[in-house]
Design a protein with these regions (language model features):
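Ubiquitin-like/PB1-type beta-grasp interaction modules and other compact soluble beta-rich domains
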Residues: 1-82
Length: 83
């Protein structure tokens, strides 16, 4: 796995999200700070946020308004299913 470059974040998409976007992993520079996970989602042009989506920062589930720091890994996750 690659790490985020200084001043940037590593963004991961899983399952249907990566299928829709056409990519699984991307490094994104943080031009302004502070920035939230939701703002990263919006800057990537991934469509409207849905309350069924989940976001993890550094492998911990957080709310979309959680602040992102340079070097963080953001993972956007589709709705969980199964039983």
């Amino acid at each position: 796995m690659s790490e985020a470059e200084p001043g940037s974040v590593r963004v991961l998409l899983f399952a249907a999200l990566s299928d829709q976007a056409g990519w699984q992993e991307r490094t994104m520079p943080l031009a302004a700070q502070p920035v939230t996970a939701l703002q990263v989602w919006q800057a990537l042009g991934l469509g409207p946020w849905s309350s069924s989506l989940r976001v993890a920062i550094n492998q911990t589930l957080v709310e979309p308004d959680h602040l992102v720091q340079p070097g963080d890994e953001l993972a956007f996750l589709p709705p969980f299913t199964g039983g």
